[in-house]
Each structure stands twice: as C-alpha cells, then as structure tokens.
Regions:
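A short helix->loop->beta-strand "cap" motif at the edges of active sites that frequently abuts
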Residues: 51, 86-88, 113-116, 207
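N-terminal Rossmann-like dinucleotide-binding module
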Residues: 1-49, 171
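Rossmann-like dinucleotide-binding domain that binds NAD(P)(H)
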Residues: 152-219, 223-227, 239, 320
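A contiguous active-site-proximal alpha/beta segment in oxidoreductase catalytic domains
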Residues: 97-154
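Conserved acidic residues
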Residues: 32, 65, 140
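NAD(P)-dinucleotide binding in Rossmann-like oxidoreductases
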Residues: 209-300
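Beta-loop-alpha module in the N-terminal Rossmann-like domain of NAD(P)-dependent dehydrogenases
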Residues: 15, 49-107
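C-terminal helix-rich "cap/oligomerization" subdomain common to oxidoreductases
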Residues: 59, 66-69, 290-292, 299-344
Length: 344
C-alpha cells in the first residue's frame, strides 16, 4: 500500500514521521512521498525522511493507493475531490470540509469509487478516553473545555471548526440521540473568524452538552467531564496530561480492588459524598483511577486507517461522522451569527 502525504506543515510532518515508522514495521505499507504548495518545505521534508518530493498533486496521485490530507481546512474539498476521482483512499484531517454540501459530494464520490474516507478526529483515539470508556455508561451531561493560544497559522476557519470540532465529534459519538436544540454565543477578537465560542447542545433523550472553545488563552486546556445515570457515575478527563478519574455508585462488594485513593482530591470528594453511603442502601461510592496506556493517538488512527483499507472494513470515524460534526458546527456558527445580528 503506497501512501502519500499532502501538506507537510507542522501536522503533516507528524503524519510523515509516523507513516515512516509504520512502514518500517510493516511489510505492505510504504510512504510514497510528500507534496506541498511550498516546494522548499516539501523538499526539506522529503530529504529529512528519505522519501520522494512530488512537484504536483497529479504525480503523487499516480504513485499512491491512498493519501493523507493535512492541508489547511479550506483546501480539503478540492484536493479530496480530485483524489477520490482517481480512486484513492483518503485520511482527511479534521474537519472533513467547511460545508455540508462539500461533505455530501465527497461522500458521494467515496461510494461511487468504492474507496474509504477516514476523518482525523484524533480524540477518538486518545488513550485517556479509551481508559474510561468502559466506566462512562450513558452520559446525560457532558462539559467540554478546549483552550489554546492564538496562532496566525490557523485563521482560515473559526474556532468552532478549528478546536471545538474535536469535542463536537466526541459528544456526538458518546450521546446516541438526535439533537433537540442548540444555543450558542461567540466573539471575533484577533481574526476575521470566531476566536471564542460556547454552545449548549440539548438532545432528544434528555442529555445536554456544554462545549467551550477559545484560541485566546495564555494556557492550554483540554478537559472533558461526564455525568452519567446508568451507571450513576462522574468521569473527568484531562487530554493534555492524559489523566483520568472516575467516581461511580456500585453495589457493596463490587468496589474496585484497585482503589488506593492516592489523589487528595479523590479522598475529599468521597468524604463530601459520604452521606451517599447512608442514603443509597446497599450502594457505595467507588473511585477508579484507570491506567492510561502510553500510546500515540495519531499513530493509532493512522494504523486504523491502514487496516480499514487493507481489510475493507468501516472506519471508526467515517465520512458520515465527519459530516455530522460539521453540520452541528454549522448550526452553532449560525446561532452565534443570529445573536450577533440581534446585538447590532
């Protein structure tokens, strides 16, 4: 399987490096080379990793069975449409496109040409999330915060498509219900697109998600909190540090055998909720500190893409998943624009 990398900026270089590692460990995977509009950058990366530098997208296409698109979001559609027409399997960095119409066309071409698209919503492969998935149950309230500093590198899209899209995808994957209502607000500060946004998403099944994203923070923050009713539990994830904690009600005798309560915060919370032991007959509050595997989420999702192509199996993050994420992102942007018009 010959795979090319399109766009070798910071993220594209990560893809190239990991693809080379995967190719080294595999008998049927080969990095065919790289392509970038910045030819100097492409040649620099090609020399660094010992691969070909293609002078055009057409030349790369002729040498590949699949490709990784790690270019700016606004260019995803045109590049993907061209490659799908040549029957290439595609890994497209998130978001899949900027509009529903573009996503629908890519999905049509994917089906028409019998190929696979996987969208790079990397947090689905985050080891911290995977460590707590078995304990989450049915989330009825999710709180997500994703903050970063301002970067001129990403100003072609709003913070909703740049950062919030990660948590939109996670929320949609964790709450299996149609959306009932969306309320949102946001502001433009240093760019012509939204730099800060917050949204409340209400679902038909009664679940709610509050999602906040900003690229105006001095410090990075990537946290997710779940409150579930079946089983009754609370889970906290810090994607930046890879740490996770779970508190849940269990029957007497079913508490985790690995319950060292090393965290002072955990001990304090159990003390605060001590009355639960008295009010919930036969139930105790258990603390679980899941062991988070030391894996590379980007490598994991690339390997999943390769296996999807190799075995002709569905992608964990499909083109339809990518479409749904940008559909919700679009509704959030529309709600923010409507609120801004009212203020004016």
């Amino acid at each position: 399987m010959n795979i090319g990398v399109i766009g070798v900026g910071k993220l594209g270089e990560f893809h190239t490096k990991l693809l080379m590692e995967i190719a080294h460990d595999s008998k049927d995977v080969h990095c065919a080379g790289v392509y970038d509009l910045n030819t100097e950058r492409a040649e620099e990366m090609a020399k660094k990793y010992g691969v070909a530098s293609f002078s055009s997208l057409e030349l790369l296409t002729r040498s590949c069975d699949a490709a990784i698109i790690a270019t700016t979001t606004s260019s995803h559609y045109e590049i993907a449409r061209t490659l799908l027409g040549e029957k290439l399997h595609l890994f497209i960095e998130k978001p899949i496109t900027t509009t529903i119409e573009e996503a629908d066309e890519l999905i049509r071409l994917e089906k028409e040409n019998g190929v696979h698209i996987q969208v790079g919503h990397i947090e689905r492969f985050n080891p911290a999330l995977r460590a707590v998935e078995a304990h989450i149950g049915r989330p009825m309230y999710i709180q997500a915060e994703r903050l970063s500093s301002f970067s001129r590198r990403v100003t072609d899209v709003s913070v909703v498509l740049d950062l919030m899209i990660h948590d939109i995808d996670l929320v949609l994957s964790l709450i299996p219900s149609e959306i009932k209502n969306i309320a949102a607000s946001g502001v433009k500060v240093f760019s012509n697109e939204l730099d800060m946004a917050t949204a409340r998403i209400d679902f038909v099944n009664g679940a709610t998600a509050n999602v906040t994203a900003s690229r105006l923070s001095r410090n990075r923050l990537r946290k997710l909190r779940f409150f579930s009713d079946n089983p009754k539990s609370y889970a906290s994830l810090d994607f930046a540090t890879g740490k996770s904690e779970v508190f849940k009600l269990v029957k007497q005798g079913e508490a985790s055998s690995k319950n060292p309560l090393k965290s002072f915060a955990a001990r304090k919370i159990l003390e605060q909720f001590g009355e639960i032991h008295e009010n919930m007959q036969g139930m105790v509050l258990d603390y679980i500190h899941p062991e988070v595997p030391k894996t590379n989420a980007l490598r994991d999702e690339l390997e999943h893409f390769i296996n999807t192509v190799r075995n002709n199996t569905p992608a964990t993050v499909s083109s339809l998943d990518g479409r749904r994420a940008i559909m919700v992102a679009g509704k959030i942007a529309e709600e923010i624009a409507a609120n801004a018009a009212i203020r004016e």
